[in-house]
C-alpha cells in the first residue's frame, strides 16, 4: 500500500495502532484501574513498563485519537489522560482477549477474576461498563436505572470488589 501501511486489512491496521505489547495494557489500566496520570500508569503497571516506552505509547495513542490529554483541574502540574469513544470501543476487544487468555493460559486467580466475570456477563455487562467509562472519561451521564445509578453497584465496582476479594483470600492463605 502506498499510504505506509502493510495492507488495508482491518486486522492489520488495528494491529499497527494497538498491536505492540504495551498499548492495550495501558488502555486496560485506564479502564480497569482508573489510572489516568502518567505516574499512576508507570508505577502501578503489573508488567513494569519503562517510562520512555510509556511516554512513546501515550504519544501514539493520543495521535491516533484513542486518548486525550488535558491539564488536571486538581493539580495544575499534572496531565490527566482520558479515553475517547474510540478508546472505550476497545473494551469488547479486551474482554474477548481476557476471556481467551483465561480459558487457555495459566493466569493468576487475582488477575483472572475480571476476565471470568466479563466472560460470564457478556456483551450486556460490557455495554454497562462502557457507559460507566463514558461517564468517567467523557462526562456523559449514564442512563437512569443503570448499574451504579441507584440500581446496585457499578460494573467497575463489582470487578474491583471481586479482585480485592481474591487478593484478600490469597493473603490469608500466605
Give the ranges of each region predicted by the language model:
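Short histidine
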Residues: 5, 22-27, 37-38, 129-133, ...
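C-terminal regulatory/oligomerization modules of transcriptional regulators
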Residues: 95, 99-174
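N-terminal helix-turn-helix DNA-binding core of bacterial DNA-binding proteins
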Residues: 9-50
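Basic, amphipathic "hinge/linker" alpha-helix immediately C-terminal to the N-terminal HTH DNA-binding motif
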Residues: 19, 73-97
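Extended, folded domain segments that form the structural surfaces/walls around functional sites
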Residues: 35-43, 86, 90, 99-103, ...
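Short, contiguous, well-ordered secondary-structure segments
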Residues: 1-5, 14, 29, 65-71, ...
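Canonical helix-turn-helix DNA-binding module
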Residues: 46-76
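N-terminal leader segment of winged-helix/HTH proteins
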Residues: 1-18, 160-174
Amino acid at each position: 500500500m502506498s499510504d505506509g501501511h502493510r495492507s488495508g486489512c482491518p486486522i492489520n491496521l488495528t494491529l499497527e495502532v494497538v498491536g505492540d505489547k504495551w498499548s492495550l495494557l495501558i488502555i486496560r489500566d485506564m479502564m480497569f484501574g482508573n489510572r489516568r496520570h502518567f505516574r499512576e500508569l508507570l508505577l502501578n503497571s503489573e508488567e513494569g513498563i519503562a517510562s520512555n516506552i510509556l511516554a512513546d505509547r501515550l504519544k501514539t495513542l493520543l495521535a491516533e485519537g484513542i486518548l486525550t490529554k488535558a491539564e488536571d483541574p486538581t493539580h495544575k502540574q499534572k496531565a490527566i489522560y482520558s479515553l475517547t469513544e474510540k478508546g472505550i470501543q476497545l473494551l469488547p476487544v479486551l474482554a474477548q482477549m481476557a476471556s481467551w487468555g483465561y480459558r487457555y493460559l495459566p493466569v493468576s486467580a487475582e488477575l483472572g477474576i475480571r476476565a471470568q466475570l466479563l466472560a460470564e456477563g457478556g456483551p450486556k455487562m460490557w455495554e454497562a461498563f462502557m457507559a460507566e467509562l463514558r461517564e468517567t472519561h467523557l462526562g456523559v451521564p449514564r442512563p437512569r436505572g443503570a448499574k451504579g445509578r441507584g440500581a446496585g453497584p457499578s460494573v467497575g465496582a463489582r470487578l474491583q470488589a471481586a479482585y480485592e476479594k481474591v487478593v484478600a483470600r490469597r493473603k490469608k492463605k500466605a
